[in-house]
Amino acid sequence: MYKTVLFDLDGTLLNTIDDLADSANRVCAAHGWPQYETAQYRYFVGNGIPKLVERFSPASCRSPEQLAATLAEFDKVYGAHMHDKTAPYPGMPALLARLKAAGVRMAVFSNKADEFARAVVARYFDADLFEVVRGALPDVPTKPATEGTRALMARLGVEADGSVLYVGDSNVDVETAHNAGLPCCGVLWGFRKREDLT
């Protein structure tokens, strides 16, 4: 039995895609840029908000200065709308409660900006479920790089010895687990298809 589970957030614990897509399209509309269907945003997300901003910005608007300005704009819009449609996946709160009752330690590890990751977890889940909630930090490479995973595991005092399971919904999560030497459970209710997890 696994003693510790590291969960991805968006597409794994929470269905956040509508709020992410709507916020991005609000930014696009404000600039007169093309907007995208929600289904397309499923492949824009996963590598962090800066990469999301780069993907929805037109090629002519991707200078470092332009992307920084668009990122700040997106953060403001998303911060105001990140709870409009977001919700836990059905059965997730009950599953987490059962794991907690069984003595399984749990943490959240997301490429979502740290402040947003903490905010949505605090909004939708009991405060004592997760020992650590960690989102993307400015000085730490995002998943699937190993630095963040190793730092999180060190904080939890665990090692890649077969007792830690990583759970996520995308190829980024599969790569994250592989790079850290962890077994991975890929969920099929999230943002990607089964073939994206192999």
What are these regions (language model features)?
Residues P93-A101, V174-H178:
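Surface-exposed amphipathic alpha-helices with a cationic face
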Residues L188:
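Nucleotide-sugar donor-binding loop of glycosyltransferases
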Residues D84-A87, A113-V167, N171-A180, R194-D196:
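Substrate-recognition "cap/lid" segment bordering the active-site pocket of phosphatases
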Residues L6-D8, F109, V167:
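Generic enzyme active-site microenvironment
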Residues Y2-L9, L13-A94, A102, E115:
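N-terminal helical cap/lid subdomain that shapes the substrate entry/recognition surface
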Residues F191:
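PG/GG-rich flexible active-site loop of Rossmann-like NAD(P)H-dependent oxidoreductases
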